[in-house]
């Protein structure tokens, strides 16, 4: 009886050792195969990235035929597009799936699904303060509103250029502009800006520094104002501080990944006459006003022509169109 039990135990022990040996052998073989396959994949992936101009070219016809480089990337496959529109557009369209519809239409123009972002703003003031120009290409739709031409024109100057801005303390200091690129930018729900130029003795020129009613008004009840005064002359300023803020800004140059489409209006607003706009390349265009669906269809149709006058940025910016320095 005891002999049978010992034999059974010995059998299971030998079986366990044998199975363990087989498993270890299989593991070594699998490791060898996996390492080999991984090595081959790495080598092939490196070789496949080379400029293989002759791969899959037919030899049946004339070799003078021009063939496109098969490794060339599509223009927009790795680009992002931000489309900014007023709240009025969404309200009028009144369709919960309208963005999905437009995304599919942009796909027909070479913009992959997920590369186009739709950003809503309520008014010019909100957009000028915090535009969030994140994308490689940024297209802003602004509906022309009679009486707001100046705000729209100055918004265009603001977002089509990069600015470096400092806070201004007009209660303590006088300020002067040092050149054509130096402007004072005020924004708020209602901005009225008055200035009093000063002579070398800090006396008012045509105004009294102690009486703001004698100051010259350079902006009156505007949401956004880019103030330009005589260079190299000190000025005392008066601003409606409760509804407006003002900054001392220098124009650094064009923001070439931004374009503006004016919706409606008899004439396109032109900011290229400004001597500080350099180079004199206008990234503003106009479409007729009918319905917002018609506007978006037009944008989709011409989006690739629009981005041709723009330059893709290698980095995204969220600087409210300015850089703040304190």
UniProtKB/Swiss-Prot annotation:
Miscellaneous comment in the UniProt entry for this protein: Some rotavirus strains are neuraminidase-sensitive and require sialic acid to attach to the cell surface. Some rotavirus strains are integrin-dependent. Some rotavirus strains depend on ganglioside for their entry into the host cell. Hsp70 also seems to be involved in the entry of some strains.
Keyword Disulfide bond: yes
Function: Calcium-binding protein that interacts with rotavirus cell receptors once the initial attachment by VP4 has been achieved. Rotavirus attachment and entry into the host cell probably involves multiple sequential contacts between the outer capsid proteins VP4 and VP7, and the cell receptors. Following entry into the host cell, low intracellular or intravesicular Ca(2+) concentration probably causes the calcium-stabilized VP7 trimers to dissociate from the virion. This step is probably necessary for the membrane-disrupting entry step and the release of VP4, which is locked onto the virion by VP7.
Protein name listed in UniProt: Outer capsid glycoprotein VP7
Amino acids binding Ca(2+) 2: 177, 228-229, 231, 301
Xref: Pfam families: VP7
Chain residue ranges for the region called CNP motif: 165-167
Region span, GPR motif: 253-255
Molecular function (Gene Ontology), one example: metal ion binding
Subunit text: Homotrimer; disulfide-linked. 2 Ca(2+) ions bound at each subunit interface in the trimer hold the trimer together. Interacts with the intermediate capsid protein VP6. Interacts with the outer capsid protein VP5*.
Gene Ontology CC annotation, any one: T=13 icosahedral viral capsid
Keyword tags: Calcium, Capsid protein, Disulfide bond, Glycoprotein, Host endoplasmic reticulum, Host-virus interaction, Metal-binding, Outer capsid protein, Signal, T=13 icosahedral capsid protein, Virion
Domain of life: Viruses
Region LVD motif: start-end pairs: 237-239
Signal sequence segment: 1-50
Family designation: Belongs to the rotavirus VP7 family.
Residues involved in Ca(2+) 1 binding: 95, 206, 214, 216
Location in the cell: Virion; Host endoplasmic reticulum lumen
Disulphide connectivity of cysteines: 82-135, 165-249, 191-244, 196-207
PTM note: N-glycosylated.
Residues listed as glycosylation sites in the UniProt record: 69
Any coiled-coil regions, as ranges: none
Regions crossing the membrane: none
Lineage: Viruses, Riboviria, Orthornavirae, Duplornaviricota, Resentoviricetes
